[in-house]
Amino acid sequence: MFNCHAHPGLYTKNALVCTASIDEISRLSPFPYRSLGSLPGYKTDMSVIENWAKTETFIGEVGVDKRFDNKERQFSILSDILSIAEKHHNIVIFHHVGWTEEFLNTVFSFNLCGFIVHSFNMSYEIYKGIGRHNGLVSLSPKAEKTKFFSTLRERGIIYPFLTETDTETGIEEREILKTWNDKLSSIFHIDMEKEVEDTFFSYISSCPLLGQK
C-alpha cells in the first residue's frame, strides 16, 4: 500500500515523503522516495533546490498559495523552480491554493518530465486537462467533500489518480490510507491499492534519470 503524499515521520519505503521547506532536507535522507519542497511562507534558496535536483527524482511540494501575499514573487519562485525541474528532468509535486488559471498556465508552459498535483480539489475539467498534459492528481480523504469528487462519481474516471494522506508517516498514516483506499475501491469498483501502486510506479519509470540518480 503506497502513500503518494506524506511528510517525514516514521521510516517507511511505502510513501513519497515530501517537505514544505528546504530546512527539512535532513529529515528526508532515510526515505527511498523523497521530495524536497519550498512553499510560500518558507525560506527559499535556489542553489539548495538545484543541488537536490541534480541527484534526486522528485521536487516538491512547490506551488502558489493565495493565503500568502506577494503573488508576483510566488509565481517568480515557482517559475525558477520549474526551470530547474525541466533542466534536470525531475518530477514535480505541486501544492495549489488559488490563482488557478495562472498556476496552470505556468505549469503547462514548462516541458516537465512529470508532475503530480497533490490534495487535488479543482474541477473535473481541470482534472482532465492535467491528464492531457501527462500529469497526475492525488486525492486525500478531504477530497470526498469536494464538488470535484461528486462529479468524479457521476462521470467516472477518465485518467487514473493517486491517493495520499498528507500526514506524517506512521501507524495512523497507514490506517488513514487503508480506510481511504477501501472506500474508493467500494465507490469505483476497483482495487484502489493496486491501481495506485501500478499507476505511480509506471508513471515514475518514465523519468529518464530514475535509477541513475
Predicted feature residues:
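Mid-domain alpha/beta scaffold segments of enzyme catalytic cores
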Residues: M1-K213
